[in-house]
């Protein structure tokens, strides 16, 4: 809930390339599932149209908000090759660049928390990520993602102290007391135009 509210704060629009070329490989970045397109549809305006106020090879989007939960595996954090189209699909964290990537229910993925945390050490420290092509090459890409881990496990169950120090902000969100819950409920009901029985 907090991450979604943070995402809904009005922010500047961002531009992303539809595709990225690296070492002769094509990476498909724009994903309509995660990227809310705000410019004209590509079929309506050509890349050379004078009406366009920016380079037509870029797409204007709202900052992305991407969530993955228990289904997350390490291969989802690397390039995915499609042999039919001979094109790579960008991983979730690259699609989340300039936005928020929430790993929800952290510690309950198909891989251990240590493996997931180890995957993020370099990107969190250097603000770059390295992705692997099936031919053996690597692509260095920017890592400008606000990464959020959400968990109901204790921090010591998730990783060692050295890694937890790398996470700049930590927030404990406790369950509200009964009186706090009643107040929250009343406020929400009023905001929706509903009456609340005092009993």
Give the ranges of each region predicted by the language model.
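Conserved C-terminal "switch" segment of AAA+ ATPases
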Residues: 156, 173-199
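Short acidic (Asp/Glu) and glycine-rich catalytic loops that position anionic groups and cofactors
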Residues: 97-101, 162-167, 180-185, 199
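Conserved H-loop
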Residues: 152
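Conserved ASCE/P-loop NTPase catalytic core
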Residues: 1-148
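Switch/connector loops and helix/strand junctions flanking conserved nucleotide-binding motifs
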Residues: 4, 14-15, 110-111, 155-160, ...
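A short helix-turn-beta junction within AAA+ P-loop NTPase domains corresponding to the substrate/partner-engaging
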Residues: 119, 159-175
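Short, surface-exposed helix-loop/turn micro-motifs enriched in polar/charged residues
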Residues: 112, 139, 159, 196-197
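Short, contiguous acidic/charged loop-to-helix segments that flank catalytic cores in large enzymes
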Residues: 108-111, 137-138, 170-176, 192
């Amino acid at each position: 809930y907090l991450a979604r509210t943070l995402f809904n704060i009005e922010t500047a629009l961002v531009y992303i390339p539809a595709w990225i070329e690296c070492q002769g490989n094509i990476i498909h970045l724009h994903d309509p599932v995660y990227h809310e397109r705000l410019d004209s549809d590509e079929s309506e305006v050509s890349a050379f149209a004078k009406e366009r106020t920016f380079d037509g090879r870029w797409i204007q989007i709202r900052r992305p908000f991407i969530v993955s939960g228990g289904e997350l595996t390490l291969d989802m954090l690397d390039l995915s090759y499609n042999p039919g189209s001979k094109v790579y699909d960008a991983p979730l964290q690259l699609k989340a660049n300039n936005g928020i990537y929430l790993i929800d229910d952290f510690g309950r993925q198909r891989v251990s928390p240590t493996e997931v945390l180890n995957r993020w050490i370099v990107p969190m420290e250097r603000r770059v990520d390295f992705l692997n092509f099936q031919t053996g090459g690597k692509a260095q890409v920017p890592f400008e993602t606000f990464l959020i881990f959400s968990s109901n496990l204790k921090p010591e169950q998730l990783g060692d102290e050295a890694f937890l120090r790398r996470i700049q902000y930590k927030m404990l969100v406790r369950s509200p007391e009964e009186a706090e819950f009643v107040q929250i409920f009343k406020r929400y009901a009023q905001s929706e135009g509903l009456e609340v029985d005092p009993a």
